[in-house]
Amino acid sequence: MRKNFGAKPYTYPQPVFILASYGEDGTPDAMNAAWGGISGGSEVTMCISARHKSTENILKKKAFTISMADAAHVKECDYVGLASANDTPDKLAKAGFTV
């Protein structure tokens, strides 16, 4: 389902964004990003650390998706926020997500 939230400098309550990407070898990855929001009619802003595997993936592959976590997937979304793809390359599968 798509919903237009309009431009907002801050989002309340603070949602958990799930930023997903693929590694160079095609391995899917996802991370939680709490620092972000809708910054324009057609843009979002995400603040992520250079140390994240997702950052490396995005810079190399030039592609990613952003979704919002929902109540039905709290455990799965929490797991991708706790586990690092640098240490757990198959963390999406371990979280229970399928691609």
Residue ranges and their predicted role:
Residues 1-31, 37-99:
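Active-site-proximal mixed secondary-structure blocks
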